[in-house]
């Protein structure tokens, strides 16, 4: 299993950073409705939206943009590990946010197309 270690390590690192930003912006990991709202916003945030958040002088906006960027890395890590037959799992924040992202994606929310 050592060949899969970097996926688990990446998940741990992402979990820590997701948790820190979530706490800073007041995310309630135990509120499925609010998690889905956050996931919907993350999935529908265009590259321009992301840059606006990341460049914002408002701390809450900047942290939200960082959380959205981390969610993209989280999804990429899960997708890449799944392609080789390894399921990546993080901690409670990862699971809550990942579940909400998957539910919103299943409900039809899609990331904007590149260049859109």
What is the role of each PLM region?
Residues 69-116:
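Amphipathic alpha-helical binding modules
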Residues 9-14, 25, 100-103:
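Exposed, low-complexity/repetitive linear segments and helix-based recognition motifs
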Residues 17-78:
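Amphipathic alpha-helical interaction modules
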Residues 9, 27-30, 92:
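Short coil/turn linker and secondary-structure boundary residues
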Residues 1-20:
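Intrinsically disordered, low-complexity linker/tail regions enriched in Pro/Ser/Thr
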